[in-house]
Amino acid sequence: QFVVSPGLDEAIVQAAQTAGLAVYPGAVTAIGSDGAGRVTAVGSGVTGLHPGDRLALPAFGCLRSHVTLPAPMVCRIPDSLGIEQAAGLPVAYITAWYGLMELAHVKAGQTVLIHAASGGVGLAAMSICRRAGARIFATAGNDRKRALIREQGAELVMDSRSAGFAEEVMKATQGRGADVVLNSLTGELQELSLNLVRDGGTFIELGKSGVRPLGNLDNSLGTMRYFPVDLVVLGDTEPELMAGIFSRVIRDCAEGRLDLLPVRSFDIDDYNTAFRFMLATRHTVKIVLRWPG
């Protein structure tokens, strides 16, 4: 593949691992949302990066042999962290940290409901909440996934495909509701989740469907704060904030303050097997494609 020269403040990274293979309805980007590799070239305005450096990167559409992106949006991988492990961290941890810590300001003792908690963002969110000392309520779609999140320290584990979680949350909080809901459900289950947020609490919307216009929420939801999260928008509007979060979570994962995410690697030539594995929806690992060399 032909690789162009980097712009003034850009870096070109030769991919070693690519993660984030899911395609969402309405998505306009190509496949691949994060990964890791080595620098092959940097622009004349870039300092602190050199050819050969190992980098992790959140870059939508990065399922390609080389990725060109702004230098501030990459993060050097510490020596203690494997490149395969690093590839699965960027989007999951940036999303979870931004929602929980920058928007919701999760604190010790607060109750956080995490939907679909066995996925990458969910597992990252659980690790962040454990570190913060929050109570974790979590949902997942089958028994195996629920067993996993129970092992990860969830106090209350429920079925993400059944409306019964709403009653369980209200019972466990004596009718008060959760301080924070990290949502990825849709339809009726999304509506139920909106009504589980206590007055003054925070609803973080990760889904791409059913997102409500800010300032247009039903008055019945009281004083709840509502934030949709979109990393493409965050990278465009607040690149320094996103880069700061990225650097912090990579460092914390390398130093053991946050948990690494489980990964399963496939050779790039075996991409069909990787996609079939992903579409089976039974996995609880981050799927990574491994490039040659």
Features from the language model and the residues they span:
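C-terminal capping/lid region of NAD(P)-dependent oxidoreductase domains
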Residues: V112, G175-V180, E191, I250-R264, ...
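Glycine-rich phosphate-binding loop and adjacent beta-alpha segment
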Residues: A132-R150, E188-D252, W291-P292
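Mid-domain Rossmann-like dinucleotide-binding core that forms the NAD(H)/NADP(H) cofactor-binding site
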Residues: P90-A163
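Short helix-loop-beta connector
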Residues: H50, D79-I83, H105-T111, G175-R176
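A glycine-/small-residue-rich N-terminal strand-loop-strand element
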Residues: Y24, I31-F60, P78-S80, G133
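Glycine-rich cofactor phosphate-binding loops and adjacent beta1-alpha1 units
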Residues: A104-V106, G120, I128, E155-T223
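N-terminal glycine-rich beta->alpha transition that marks the start or flank
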Residues: Q1-G35, C62
